[in-house]
Amino acid sequence: MKKIHIKTYGCQMNENDSEVAKFYLEEEGYEITNNENDADIVILNTCVVRKKSEDKFYSHIGELKKQNKIIGIMGCGAEKEKEKLFKRGVKFVIGTRAIPLIPQAVERAINGKKSAIFEDKMDEIDYKKILKRNSKHHAWITIIYGCNRFCTYCIVPYTRGREKSRKMDDIINEVENLAKSGIKEVTYLGQNVDAYGKDLNDGSSLAKLLNLTKDIEEIERIWFLTSYPTDFSLDIAHEVANSSKITKNIHLPVQHGSNKILKKMNRRYTIEEYIELINDIRKIVPDASISSDIIVGFPDETEEDFEKTVELVKNIKFERLNLAIYSPREGTIAWKYFEDNVPRIIKTKRMAYILNLQKEINKQLNENYLNKTVEIIVETKAKSGLYYGRDIRNKIIAFEGDKSLIGKKVLVKVKKTTAGPLYGDIIKIL
């Protein structure tokens, strides 16, 4: 039987999709290998949120062609490029909701035939059977597919489709089975995770799902992302406040500090409304760790607009910030109607300014951890040789350890702080 390697680009949802694809391929007898060189077939699970990520997978296709590998494409790149990928030597293209049909595409490719499959088969996935995960203690769990927001810069609604929630019972059954298999942490995923349940019309919601999940004894920590400000219910904040299992990290992308730019982005809230929401969350969850996303250099962004973003970053003091320079994505509203009129040199300068500002904020916030004892779940070994884990506020703490600690709760006393990771010594294994 042919050996298959799956290379995953992009978001955590792609990670989960790759796990699902591996399940279906192994069910049909294919061998999954972590070594691309050993594989007869290489499937790229692609991302096109930014041009850089799209360029990466196209470059990878070129390398694989030289090796005469059978190439398959899944993920958002498959949805965006579709049959155009055949011109690059790709043998099959699988849409984001057609993963259960991937063995059929592989079989056809082995027999020299091309496939482009874009059917919606997500309702056929029996997630409770998919117990094999990339981590032995943590699982990504997609609870809602797609997005209805249509931000003008974003390709996701076109590649992932409209919002579609999974049944709550199905999700809980999956978590219970994963818990029995040794999983201790779960992360609920959605392009707009707060919208979970709204399309089901049966009372399902993210807050209710979190409430049910915390009662599963073996599950020690529950994460969720990514949130959209106008869909974030304070019921979610109350669940976070009332449970020691639900993480205090709330990722709430703002994207910009100027109302003019937010309107142009079709973000559907004002900066005043965003700040009010953050204040409300912090009243309910005083130790909440708020992280966010910001885009610099969006069309028509003036120096005044940029300064409003700077002021926002200074005032909110995000624990973490994902920064991106705007790049037009073909097929989006911004690509079609807005001129990309902020010079690259100015975009780069603005990006660097906020990056340095955020580093200073991180450094100040992290100093509060010095000499404190923190409970973390150990994740893996870093390139530095140190092991690391995260606390309930998503702080990364590195320490001397060994692989027997992976997946375990430990107490670490913080001895050193930086703008990035914290460093400490193990006090106790829990």
Curated annotation (Swiss-Prot):
The keyword S-adenosyl-L-methionine applies. CDD domains: Radical_SAM (cd01335). Its cofactor is [4Fe-4S] cluster. [4Fe-4S] cluster 2 binds at residues 147, 151, 154. Catalyzes the methylthiolation of N6-(dimethylallyl)adenosine (i(6)A), leading to the formation of 2-methylthio-N6-(dimethylallyl)adenosine (ms(2)i(6)A) at position 37 in tRNAs that read codons beginning with uridine. [4Fe-4S] cluster 1 binds at residues 11, 47, 76. This is tRNA-2-methylthio-N(6)-dimethylallyladenosine synthase. Monomer. Its EC number is 2.8.4.3.
